[in-house]
Amino acid sequence: MRKKRNKNLYGEVYALGQHISMSAHKARRVIDQIRGRSYEETLMILELMPYRACYPIFKLVYSAAANASHNMGFNEASLVISKAEVNEGTTMKKLKPRARGRSYAIKRPTCHIRIVLKDKSFYEEENFFCLKQSEWKKKKKYTDMTYHYMDKGGGLWDKK
């Protein structure tokens, strides 16, 4: 089985949680609320939301911020959640014994959550130094407009 390599660009840090025991649909409901927000705002939102999926996502966001500050030396106040994705994991299957020797299948879904944090101050500095206004080229707009009067005849459909 091939493993997909993650392209870790400079300025981005991620945390990955695998085999979290909850439905991917329920985790996506929380992830959609925090995508694109700052780190501090995300922590406040996750503490106040009443869903069970908030706790593992809170731990992952906190872990990604710890990775950013320890490994890359980023400031936690300038972190933004650039990507947040939830994928379906394996499904645990059990049999529950029922009456008269029968059994029902019980499925426990799992999911994989990936949180990617981006340092917004790094990208602001990069854009400031790399982009100069003289390098931008403006395209000329096409302003020559010719109007054709169709009421006088002579069009394509008038020929017999």
UniProtKB/Swiss-Prot annotation:
InterPro entries: Ribosomal_uL22, Ribosomal_uL22_bac/chlpt-type, Ribosomal_uL22_bac/org-type, Ribosomal_uL22_CS, Ribosomal_uL22_sf. One of its GO terms (cellular component) is chloroplast. Its main location: plastid. CDD domains: Ribosomal_L22. The keyword Chloroplast applies. It holds the Pfam family Ribosomal_L22. One of its GO terms (biological process) is translation. Keywords: Chloroplast, Plastid, Ribonucleoprotein, Ribosomal protein, RNA-binding, rRNA-binding. PANTHER family: CHLOROPLAST 50S RIBOSOMAL PROTEIN L22-RELATED, LARGE RIBOSOMAL SUBUNIT PROTEIN UL22M. Part of the 50S ribosomal subunit. This is Large ribosomal subunit protein uL22c.
